[in-house]
Amino acid sequence: MKRILSIVAISSLPFVSQADTYSVSDKFYVGLGAGIISPNDVDIDISAAGTVNGVTFSGGITGEFEFDNGYQINGLLGYRINDYLSFETELGYTKFDYDKVNLTVGGTATSGGVTFTGAASTSYDIDGSISAFSMIFGPILDFDVYENFELLLGGGIGFASYNDEIKSVGGSTGLSYDEDSTDFAAKFKTGANYSFTEQTYLQATYGFNYINSGVDNFTDDFTAHSFNANLVFNF
């Protein structure tokens, strides 16, 4: 995906206007927006019996967690180095629900004296959710295409502080927990800016999000796709 987006950006360069777009007329900018997040499945691989998040698992369990789409609210604070390069801090609040767990190899999970037994090749509905606050900092490149339209490409690193709560699985509280964590996060994004005035423009972006949230002998890291629209002001 990154290679394809890079090729698209490079191939657009011959058509880049030499005149500044409205959106690069001032150094500082702030933005506020919202969008949706589409989490990827998270693999489960519990090779040995153990306890994670206060839940005791039997060994040999494999499967995946599935999630519903959720929402994001985000803010931007940036500074333009020149006509094409900015450095930006993105603050975000994200929330989405668990959908279900798909077990490939079953086993047991015990929490609070209650044991959940999951069968192989079976799916169970989950009552639970994840909410997160994130901060990402990094460079943004933008390329003028028309007088008030430009493409952007960027990314950054930072952290995500999140609450991960499962209330029940398949109606059982045997796999229930409520944990707070803070982990390394990164984001790649691309999109476009459309200027309304010299101080105001609309930004639409696609983002690929990564959180180093994997737990040894339990789950892999978290990744997700996001689609956002922001109203941005220069000053």
Where are these regions (language model features)?
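Cleavable N-terminal export/targeting peptides
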Residues: 1-26
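Gram-negative (and chloroplast) outer-membrane scaffold detector with strong preference
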Residues: 20-28, 34-42, 71-168, 194, ...
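Surface-exposed strand-loop-strand hairpins of Gram-negative outer-membrane beta-barrel proteins
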Residues: 37-73, 178-182
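Short acidic, glycine/proline-rich loop/turn micro-motifs
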Residues: 44, 165-172, 214-217
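Conserved binding-pocket/active-site segment within a compact domain
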Residues: 165-170, 180-184, 191-195
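Outer membrane beta-barrel transmembrane domains
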Residues: 184, 191-193, 200-209, 225-235
